[in-house]
Design a protein with these regions (language model features):
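Active-site histidine-anchored catalytic micro-motif
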Residues: 1-88
Length: 88
């Protein structure tokens, strides 16, 4: 009853909101990469690994996992200047 979704970061919070409004009783983690994989130094694999770990330990709900942290879907935003997701 855990789901990890890889997703583009520009609309990740929008997708998280839509999923959360569906009232699905699962632990759903969205994650992605701020640096595309093709550039070689992507953060995508690190974020994916974190998302897998968070999926095993968090209660049902919708979360975003980026930069070694997890956030409730409605308490996070992407900071395009710094290249990280930040808690609201």
């Amino acid at each position: 009853s855990q789901i990890v979704i890889t997703h583009g970061t520009d609309t990740m919070t929008d997708t998280a909101r839509i999923i959360a409004n569906g009232n699905i009783e699962k632990t759903i983690i969205l994650t992605g990469a701020m640096i595309p994989y093709k550039f070689g130094s992507s953060d995508g694999l690190f974020n994916f690994g974190g998302a897998l770990a968070f999926a095993q330990s968090l209660p049902p709900g919708v979360y975003i996992a980026m930069n070694g942290r997890y956030f409730d879907w409605d308490k996070v935003k992407k900071n395009r200047k710094t290249g990280v997701f930040e808690e609201l």
